[in-house]
Amino acid sequence: MADGKARIDEGAFTEVAFDFAAGPVGPEKAIALVPRGADGAERYPVLVALHGRGESVRGIEAGARGWVDDYDLGRAISRLRSPPLMREDFRGFVDDARLARINASLAARPFRGLIVVCPWVPDILSSRDRSSLDAALPFGDFVVDHLLPRVVAETPARDERTANGIDGVSLGGRAALIVGLAHADRFGAIGTLQAAVQDNEAGAIAARARAALANGALRIRLVTSDRDPFAGAIAQLHSAFDEGRIDHEYLVIPGPHDYAFNRGPGGIEMLLWHDRVLRGEPPL
């Protein structure tokens, strides 16, 4: 841009809070970011965005606001609405080719917006639960049976399966993968960012993915980074998906496994991918 400064759209969204006194995982809360100016006629795809373990152990209130406050997701939304993106929007974790490709794509097809729903995620990586893929299933029941019905009732959300996506980072990426595959009748897209999968889990997750595909076409994306401690396990999962002929996207981008990644490429990549695939379009 001429002045070298990024444009920030301060009015990009409004917040809607959802509180639950009880449910499959006990009390819960979620914050939804709803595109501002929705006039009631336009309906938006829904993305359930899940935070990492740091927010899980800080409690329900902090967890529900993890993507909003700790990961600065609102800034990512605002910048996607006001391209071109700059290197600083990715906290420096982007190469020239990908930055150019994303900006060219945004110039051709502007970001239209999602209802991003951010619930608290229980600690499914505790010493008791980390060896069990099923530890996330009660949380998945909450999302599908309690949270999504309220989102549809109280926001301008689309309700069809193909317009529902789930994604998350680290612990949240693990949860998104397990929950999305378990409820593939409700989700059309599953994304993960630096998912906290273990080295011995690729085969079991691939088996769940094959079963999930019986519900119809499913967009799956595995994103890791060059300094992600889970990169090796995610590469194994990518190989297991390839061997099982499970269609998916696999992306390795620059960045560490920390808040800077979440606030930079993590949020941007997540939002842009779901903005496209939940409308049945190519991601870039």
Model-derived segments and spans:
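Short, solvent-exposed loop/turn and secondary-structure capping segments
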Residues: 42-44, 57-65, 127-132, 179, ...
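A domain-start/cap signature at the N-terminus of enzymes
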Residues: 1-45, 54, 99, 114, ...
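C-terminal catalytic histidine-bearing segment of alpha/beta-hydrolase fold enzymes
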Residues: 219-223, 227-284
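Short, proline-enriched alpha-helix->beta-strand connector loops that line the catalytic pocket
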Residues: 110-113, 214-220, 244
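The conserved beta1-alpha1 loop
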Residues: 45, 50-52, 194
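Gly/Ser-rich "nucleophile elbow"/oxyanion-hole loop immediately N-terminal to the catalytic nucleophile
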Residues: 37-42, 129-170
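Primarily recognizes the serine-hydrolase "nucleophile elbow" in alpha/beta-hydrolase
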Residues: 160-207, 211-214
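Active-site machinery of serine-nucleophile hydrolases
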Residues: 50-145
